[in-house]
Amino acid sequence: MVVLGSTGSIGKNALKIAKKFGVKIEALSCGKNIALINEQIKVFKPKKVAILDPNDLNNLEPLGAEVFVGLDGIDAMIEECVSNLVINAIVGVAGLKASFKSLQRNKKLALANKESLVSAGHLLDISQITPVDSEHFGLWALLQNKTLKPKSLIISASGGAFRDTPLDLIAIQNAQNALKHPNWSMGDKITIDSASMVNKLFEILETYWLFGASLKIDALIERSSIVHALVEFEDNSVIAHLASADMQLPISYAINPKLASLSASIKPLDLYALSAIKFEPISVERYTLWRYKDLLLENPKLGVVLNASNEVAMKKFLNQEIAFGGFIQIISQALELYAKKSFKLSSLDEVLALDKEVRERFGSVARV
């Protein structure tokens, strides 16, 4: 298989599962962590390797692997790969072209890059995509029951770093505080997306494209991250998917469902410890951006705007140019502005053009 973004949290776990299942690695790609990909090359001996920055070529130790550079290089690498499975764990809209290329080459796409579905779900062949996250894996597992008719799909949120921060102090928080996730150890971007609830807006849109635009879709807070998803059926019964908070479960099913079902990749749940499970609504007072959930479900192509403005705001926030209130404000302004506009987005080029327009418009926003 091919692992794009092999040095990130998902990529590292995917390689662990590949080793366990005896799956050979044809190709790897990474962003800036050349030291780690050099170690991965030694262990997995891929035939092809892609890195983002040509300035890192001198430090790369490909050990005979063919080397590709940049986002176009990743596309070229996918073009040449014979593997049937591509795991796309690239962070951000940078992973969008790789998703398109993988599907064009008739590969099965294990998708951890949320931005692909958020920005271009209407253009992707969903039948070839397996989502790599705990919420959508939970929904998939629950929807295997073909007797009951689903009515609404519900995913859970931990609440992120600011779930207990006094409301009047949220706007002044910095990135260092936003990166203190209560339950998970993840990359910087997804951890901050969790604090802002952008991650859950992304996952709501992913649910829309993956499992049914006709169903009611919602989210709630479950602080322990043990309940990942719930499905309410037409008979008003509800079934929940519970599992330890460990990404190796959805990753293992994305790689090989049969092997994944025959052996455990996560620790068993201690059912006696579950007395603490409690569901809470997502408050728009605390999570201001959550008020756009219905707007996004009514016009899911606004996902391009959500993602582009989020990446612009994220960069400013991580660079300490703005506080958390400014971060939220940039995204709010972008969604309010583009909600009034009409766009078709009938091709990848049109998606990328709108993405660029939003970045240019909001990238120049002064300090907030």
UniProtKB/Swiss-Prot annotation:
Binding of 1-deoxy-D-xylulose 5-phosphate, residues: 114, 134-135, 158, 181, 194, 199-200, 203
Binding site for Mn(2+): 133, 135, 203
UniProt keyword Disulfide bond present: no
Cofactor names: Mg(2+); Mn(2+)
Record pathway: Isoprenoid biosynthesis; isopentenyl diphosphate biosynthesis via DXP pathway; isopentenyl diphosphate from 1-deoxy-D-xylulose 5-phosphate: step 1/6
Catalytic activity: 2-C-methyl-D-erythritol 4-phosphate + NADP(+) = 1-deoxy-D-xylulose 5-phosphate + NADPH + H(+)
Annotated function: Catalyzes the NADPH-dependent rearrangement and reduction of 1-deoxy-D-xylulose-5-phosphate (DXP) to 2-C-methyl-D-erythritol 4-phosphate (MEP).
Protein name stated in the entry: 1-deoxy-D-xylulose 5-phosphate reductoisomerase
Lineage, top ranks: Bacteria, Pseudomonadati, Campylobacterota, Epsilonproteobacteria, Campylobacterales
Gene designation per UniProt: dxr
